[in-house]
């Protein structure tokens, strides 16, 4: 008998797939034959650094959510992406951190007082979300109703304190401010409707400690370093998986466009939850679109049900190069000097008073420069607004932006949009969205189910050893506490590589 190396095929060259391959090729030494197959023409998946108007911008993953103990932060440091040489690097998103001051404006141009109106509502929102993430919210259901209950209680307490609570007009501003923060939460979580975001699950979500930062050299540097560390030829681009026959050994992978099939002892599947949702119940992918994978046999019920219950939304970014087209005398508007300091950090409370603003623009919380003084402004969109943004011609997007700016910044200077750049994750057939969330009716248990390898449970082997994991699952939607993040994707890839390492260290033989 001649021992042969177990063959592992990793599907997807995002950070999860590259992490799995890197771990197998590193800790595994020469134990495995590893291949990474990627449907697209690049590595990185939902990590994609680009350039726009002289700035380095992130079209996908943007933040390192906590720097203390974060493997992604460590990877960025090791890749030399955290410190650009002075004069060589491009300016980049949030290079100056979070702004100290923002300009909150109600639709129509009325500046909202930061101390007496905007500040208390922001404190209410932050306090309630902190309580939810500490598991102290109480009850279940969706996050939106939880926040609205809090607003009603706040307004009742203010009214009981005298002065009649500020009247109907102030309550309308309160509602608009809460809606603004709800839009922020939608982009943070990818949920189209916060009524569908499970309140209880918020208590399980965790970030790493420390500040949230962006990567000066670009997020793509992280995945490029992982890919470069793999043996030459490990990553194969342009192979779109169409059928996965996993019922026996070897597992067989069939690709689109007549590419030769591959066989493997183990497959680590790192495709997005959006692609898995598109693949549900379809043994034959004809007519389903380019995204779906035909599983043969179909995925077992526990896996299909977890895929169906979990939420997977879309978040898109709209970058706008802006310019002031009319000069103005320097004037202090609520502590902000637009003419002198450039485009303001604008937070927008929509009240429905200006019909020229299109509905999809009302789904963003803010339009802010990517750093202080920048002529590149950024707006985030989630859900139906994000998806609709992808369908619009550039001219329509610019007109919508102009209508919004004219309403919220009516005083001189008038800000105009010269050109735009936007992401398009909803219609990208390799992803069909951005990241996962725990929907009402789902739970963290479904994230654990997503991570379970197949086949599940003991085989018929007499020694009752666990079955050899033929199909393993990694990606951000398979991590119970860090889902939706790049570090969840990375950690899950390492987890599945470790699962295979442990399987063979446990005494499994592979001979032919």
Curated annotation (Swiss-Prot):
It catalyses: spermine + O2 + H2O = 3-aminopropanal + spermidine + H2O2; N(1)-acetylspermine + O2 + H2O = 3-acetamidopropanal + spermidine + H2O2; norspermine + O2 + H2O = norspermidine + 3-aminopropanal + H2O2; thermospermine + O2 + H2O = 3-aminopropanal + spermidine + H2O2. One of its GO terms (biological process) is thermospermine catabolic process. It holds the Pfam family Amino_oxidase. Its cofactor is FAD. SUPFAM superfamilies: FAD-linked reductases, C-terminal domain, FAD/NAD(P)-binding domain. FAD binds at residues 38, 46, 476. Residues 448-470 are annotated as: Disordered. Induction: Induced in roots by exogenous treatment with spermine and thermospermine. Binds 1 FAD per subunit. It is found in: Cytoplasm. Optimum pH is 6.0 with thermospermine as substrate. Optimum pH is 8.5 with spermine as substrate. Optimum temperature is 30 degrees Celsius with thermospermine as substrate. Optimum temperature is 35 degrees Celsius with spermine as substrate. Keywords: Cytoplasm, FAD, Flavoprotein, Oxidoreductase. It comes from the Eukaryota. The keyword Thylakoid does not apply. The keyword RNA-binding does not apply. Pathway: Amine and polyamine degradation; spermine degradation. Its EC number is 1.5.3.-. GO terms for cellular component: cytoplasm. Belongs to the flavin monoamine oxidase family. Flavoenzyme involved in polyamine back-conversion. Catalyzes the oxidation of the secondary amino group of polyamines, such as spermine and its acetyl derivatives. Substrate preference is thermospermine > spermine > norspermine > N(1)-acetylspermine. No activity detected when putrescine or spermidine are used as substrates. Plays an important role in the regulation of polyamine intracellular concentration. This is Polyamine oxidase 1. It comes from Oryza sativa subsp. japonica. The gene is PAO1.
